[in-house]
Amino acid sequence: MKIDVSKVIVIGSGAIKIGEAAEFDYSGSQALKALREEGIESVLVNPNVATIQTSYELADKVYLLPLKTEFIEKVIEKEKPDGILVGFGGQTALSLGVSLYKKGILDKYNVKVLGTPIEGIERALDREKFQKTMKKVGLPVPPSDAAKTPEEAIEIAESIGFPVIVRVSFNLGGRGSFIARSREEFEKYIIRAFAQSEIRKVLVEKYLNGWKEIEFEVVRDKAGNSVAVVCLENVDPMGVHTGESIVVGPSQTLTNREYQMLRDAAIRVADAIELIGEGNVQLALSPNSEEYYVIETNPRMSRSSALASKVTGYPLAYIATKLAIGYTLDELRNTVTGITTAAFEPSLDYVAVKIPRWDFKKFEEVNKSIGSEMKSIGEVMAIGRNLHEAFQKAIRMLDIGDELIGKYYLEDEPLENVLERLKKKEPYLLMHIAKALRLGATVEDIHKITKVDKFFIYVIEDLVKIAEELRKNPTEELIREAKRLGFSDWEIELLTKRKVKKKWKPVVKNIDTLAGEFPAKTNYLYVTYDGVENDIPKPKKPSILVLGAGVFRIGVSVEFDWAVVNFVNAIRKRGIEAAILNYNPETVSTDWDMSDRLYFEEITLERVLDIYEFERPIGVVAFAGGQLANSLAKKLENAGVKLLGTSGKSVDKAENRAKFSKLLEKLGIPQPEWISAESIDEAIKLAKKIEYPVIVRPSYVLSGTAMKVAWNEKELIDFLKEAASVSPEHPVLISKFIPGTEAEIDAVSDGKKVVGVTLEHIEGAGVHSGDSTMVTPWRTLSERNVKRIWEITYELAKELEIKGPFNVQFVIDKKPYVLELNLRTSRSMPFSSKSRGVNLMELSAQAVLDGELKIGVEGKYYEIPPVAYGVKSPQFSWAQLQGAYPFLGPEMRSTGEVAALGTHYEDALLKSWLSVKPNELPKTSALIYGWEKKNILKETAKILENLGITTYSIGGDIGEINISKQEAVNMIKEGKIDIIMTTGYAKDKDYEIRRLAADLNVPLVLDANLALELAKAIEWKTKTQEEFEIKELREYWIRKIEENVEEYAASVVLRR
């Protein structure tokens, strides 16, 4: 029986950060879908502009606002909802729900908490209350105690005895948690742990070294009926955060007795916290007996529940929403099968493996060991008929330039080096295990070091035996067995040094959650060589295959999933079937009902061609999924695949630096001068010729990694030495650094005309566009230059016969220079679309599928008119990346983004900046310092001083009070600094200050231009006494904005 609610406010999770990523876009989207089905109006508050959920496909109303109590209260006051869902936006949403409840805001406006009651949430998230609850119901917990001060925590640690693990209350991604083996180590990290807890509380617990970590996903309804949907087993033992662990589903090493015992405990945990909806229960099991402990529970959708949904095909978030609004399990149907109720526990005839992906190369001084705190950026999930195959696929999906039995495996080095990596817990455990076994380590040796169950090590040993046999005697029978166990053609060719003849075809299998026990029609598919026949017939209707974005990493995030889902919607609206190929368990695109067929598979040339042969689509879309899909464009075209949109040949011309440069020369379009050097001496000589400053990028490095600005010869030499090798095989590109204003155009072309949006960066040149704060409409560019960048954009579209979405980046110093052209969707396209109220992916569908843009405007190019100011801000995850030095440069380091719109620019800027964690406006003090752009920093300090804020500075006369570095450090530790504003790169001078700010959640502004803009916006808000504008997205789209903006934007009417 449904609860009587007609309007529900849903709290999102905000920007993507380490520990709180796209899994909440997926779960939130499912929740919105379930509400719409029930005819309940949904009001979503989430500043994450890049997600699917902040568009009207799913939500009825969308507010791009900071996730802070005062903003949510304003939305509640305005919208008057009668219910609130807080279990679908990660820790952020749960904490906000508790805060709204405790401040009496929910009672004041009569808003019901749907799902698990707030008392239950507190029993789960407050470590002390959780321990008491477990003891009360007779469930075992490890020896532990809660502390409210560092001194108390030290006493508890001493009484329990080292080693201990410290867990933080009301927190996500294990932030601030640590393992200490001594008092000295404990004292070093305890202050940071308290800073990362919203309620300043930690739990000190006995460290269960070498115990197995097991997770259950439990669904429970208001009547107390429960289902254990899946049991996931962590390959890594206790002490490694589950988000950092390799996870296998279903569990592989539990006996039936152990499984039933832990399942029973998980259901009792759900009962004890009065869970309504979905929760995740983590348990520790002794490897030597049946002793176990309950570790923790999350009474909400989590990373593990997104994974569990994709592992089993059981739509957890959708079912959890229905339970929250009052249904019981037996009243709900499992929408995947269509024939069983939600009370059926899924049964699997395959195995799924999740492996995280790290991006440590992009961060300086970062601690690379993995442990109790999350540092991974994304994750992959592989499905196989056997564990060997699933392990192999998962490593390929990470897209790290190697495979499980690949180049690293074959490189010779001392065994001790590899064992040392295993001891330090460095990423990509399976690759180190395989290499150690090849170099002579035994299963026992590896088990002793890693505490990984021998069962998993034996699986890797099987692969190593096959690999070594392939090197010696590659028979046809052996190659066939290697394919069954997940070896790719590339691996086999590397080992045998001969081409693989395609003699066998893989089969397509479906996931029905029932292990084939009941007939069920599902479209959730995977491909394997370990099978005899296809589970589904070859498709008969015309279809289009869309390649997804694959694993998220820095630079590739939910923006590309937004593009994939929007393009797929456009295909299906046109009556054509759409198939998606993707393997990211966190995303909306890998939701089985987003497409007509979902291939949960690797995005490699070999696998795309297998699926292309089976699916026989009318074309393949590679431009929506970002770099991974786009980089296959030319290879696919060469293999005879029909690509939709811009040709693979054109993509290659834009991607290849030398070819693109020649093209710009031919068209007479200015570009920063650049050269390619094959030795350090040549690089020094050529850099002198084009004059400093220069941007240096070694060519053999992935994803814009290792790009730096060198201001003089010494910096250039230092950097090239760091780059390890510069040679004819690894030339280094050196281009003139032009310190101007950066701008870009997000556009769509049908080959005849171009339509799009201009974006201006607030930070100066030399900061990666993904780390820049962007504003639209532009504010400081001249009319002449804006007209010129549009002309250039049109010329490039015409020359390269662009059909579909693309993005051009410029630096403007008196005149525009082209920096790069991306012939695909860009990171900023969701922002461009939502800031103007026009979906660029729908326009892309017009260009690609209908053959022309239907915009009803004559001329070559046209800018979509602005409806409001839009500001997009980057979200960094410095707090999670222990030791990393926070700074901005030509290499991207942010993990997510947020945005806000406003009638006034200042309002949009402040709301956008406040949507980034841990930003708060300064009340009494600011530390402002730097060794470059001093005039801008001085102006910033002056404005804040005039507003009554005390400004401090180190090593100069920027703020009103000059203090020593040590004084600054002490003030930060004592909580006496509200905000830190600095600029540039000065690791040898201020590493401790910046790192401390990240560790203690002090807002950190890393660019002088942005600091000044924020100071001016704070001044504007103080002087005008303006309240923050609380408007729903559509309210901006349907009304004119401030007259002067209207005139200002119209002064360059781009309809040439």
Curated annotation (Swiss-Prot):
It catalyses: hydrogencarbonate + L-glutamine + 2 ATP + H2O = carbamoyl phosphate + L-glutamate + 2 ADP + phosphate + 2 H(+). Mg(2+) 2 binds at E296, N298. Mn(2+) 4 binds at E820, N822. InterPro entries: ATP-grasp, ATP_grasp_subdomain_1, CarbamoylP_synth_lsu, CarbamoylP_synth_lsu_oligo, CarbamoylP_synth_lsu_oligo_sf, CbamoylP_synth_lsu-like_ATP-bd, CbamoylP_synth_lsu_CPSase_dom, MGS-like_dom. It is an enzyme of class 6 (ligase). Pathway: Amino-acid biosynthesis; L-arginine biosynthesis; carbamoyl phosphate from bicarbonate: step 1/1; Pyrimidine metabolism; UMP biosynthesis via de novo pathway; (S)-dihydroorotate from bicarbonate: step 1/3. Residues 537-919 are annotated as: Carbamoyl phosphate synthetic domain. Residues 131-325, 661-849 form the ATP-grasp domain. NCBIfam families: CPSaseII_lrg, PRK05294.1, PRK12815.1. Belongs to the CarB family. This is Carbamoyl phosphate synthase large chain. It comes from Pyrococcus furiosus (strain ATCC 43587 / DSM 3638 / JCM 8422 / Vc1).
